[in-house]
């Protein structure tokens, strides 16, 4: 990624979003440098994840990603590993024996 010293350029340029799951075949990587018409992404320096069970919020995880000074190399932030909820209602295979964990992923990033 080329680094620009133009004062008219934005201070922060987000070039990539990568989602990592230890049981997935590989990371899901979104290139944010090309045509972004199909993406609706809001970038902030805070990562918040809500966990719901039967429509009720049971957990909220909040990470401060940080503040970074300018440099030529890209910065990388990796959140700590998280464990999915356990129990009868928290499963990846439903009553019809459909395995949701190994299927195609859908990602919704919204406010």
UniProtKB/Swiss-Prot annotation:
Modified residues (N6-succinyllysine): 60
Annotated GO MF terms: GTPase activator activity; Rho GDP-dissociation inhibitor activity
Keyword Acetylation: yes
Biological process (GO), any one: Rho protein signal transduction
Residues that bear N6-acetyllysine: 60
GO CC annotation terms, alphabetical: cytosol; membrane
Cross-link (Glycyl lysine isopeptide (Lys-Gly) (interchain with G-Cter in SUMO2)): 57, 60
Main location: cytoplasm
PTM comment: The N-terminus is blocked.
Entry superkingdom: Eukaryota
Stored SUPFAM superfamilies: E set domains
InterPro entries, alphabetized: Ig_E-set, Rho_GDI, RhoGDI_dom_sf
Subcellular location: Cytoplasm
Crosslink feature (Glycyl lysine isopeptide (Lys-Gly) (interchain with G-Cter in SUMO1)) location: 57, 60
Keywords noted in UniProt: Acetylation, Cytoplasm, GTPase activation, Isopeptide bond, Ubl conjugation
PANTHER family xrefs: RHO GDP-DISSOCIATION INHIBITOR (PTHR10980), RHO GDP-DISSOCIATION INHIBITOR 1 (PTHR10980:SF9)
Function: Controls Rho proteins homeostasis. Regulates the GDP/GTP exchange reaction of the Rho proteins by inhibiting the dissociation of GDP from them, and the subsequent binding of GTP to them. Retains Rho proteins such as CDC42, RAC1 and RHOA in an inactive cytosolic pool, regulating their stability and protecting them from degradation. Actively involved in the recycling and distribution of activated Rho GTPases in the cell, mediates extraction from membranes of both inactive and activated molecules due its exceptionally high affinity for prenylated forms.
Family, per entry: Belongs to the Rho GDI family.
Subunit structure as annotated in this protein's UniProt entry: Monomer. Interacts with FER. Interacts with PLXNB3. Forms a heterodimer with RAC1. Interacts with RHOA, the affinity is increased by three orders of magnitude when RHOA is prenylated. Interacts with PSMD10; the interaction increases ARHGDIA association with RHOA, leading to ARHGDIA-mediated inactivation of RHOA and ROCK and prolonged AKT activation. Interacts with KANK2; the interaction is direct and may regulate the interaction of ARHGDIA with RHOA, RAC1 and CDC42. Interacts with RHOC. Interacts with CDC42. Interacts with NGFR (via death domain); NGFR binding decreases the affinity for RHOA.
Protein name as catalogued: Rho GDP-dissociation inhibitor 1
Species of the source: Cavia porcellus (Guinea pig)
UniProt lineage: Eukaryota, Metazoa, Chordata, Craniata, Vertebrata
